[in-house]
């Protein structure tokens, strides 16, 4: 969560953590899904992709290399899916550089 806050990304839902059946109606509001643990959420992400065309990222963000790749995939999705009224594209490379510079 801290990493997503650092990137100024709002979380729509964390499933199944604290979720209810009523919350499920909001799942399609997300631009894309993050699946940090394939064992838990991959089947749901595949279903949402098939039914609603929602892309997903299933790279496990563990270790500097995978976290950097995870952020780059988020970067690609945000810039691709952002409303056309938003002319400002995000650039997370400075964040990646700052987090991995001394590793």
From Swiss-Prot:
GO BP term, pick one? photosynthesis
Where in or outside the cell it occurs: the entry states: Plastid, Chloroplast
Q: Which reaction does it catalyse?
A: chlorophyllide a + oxidized 2[4Fe-4S]-[ferredoxin] + 2 ADP + 2 phosphate = protochlorophyllide a + reduced 2[4Fe-4S]-[ferredoxin] + 2 ATP + 2 H2O
Instruction: Spell out the molecular function terms from Gene Ontology.
Output: 4 iron, 4 sulfur cluster binding; ATP binding; metal ion binding; oxidoreductase activity
Tree of life domain: Eukaryota
The cofactor remark states: Binds 1 [4Fe-4S] cluster per heterodimer. The cluster is bound at the heterodimer interface by residues from both subunits.
Q: What is this protein called?
A: Light-independent protochlorophyllide reductase subunit B
- Origin organism is Araucaria heterophylla
Which lineage?
Eukaryota, Viridiplantae, Streptophyta, Embryophyta, Tracheophyta
What is the name of the gene encoding this protein? chlB
């Amino acid at each position: 969560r801290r990493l997503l806050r650092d990137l100024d990304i709002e979380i729509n839902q964390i499933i199944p953590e604290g979720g209810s059946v009523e919350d499920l109606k909001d799942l399609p509001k997300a631009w894309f899904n993050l699946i940090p643990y394939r064992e838990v959420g991959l089947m749901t992400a595949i279903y949402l992709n098939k039914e609603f065309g929602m892309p997903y990222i299933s790279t496990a963000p563990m270790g500097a290399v995978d976290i950097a790749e995870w952020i780059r995939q988020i970067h690609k999705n945000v810039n691709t899916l952002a409303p056309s009224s938003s002319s400002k594209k995000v650039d997370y490379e400075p964040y990646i550089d700052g987090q991995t510079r001394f590793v």
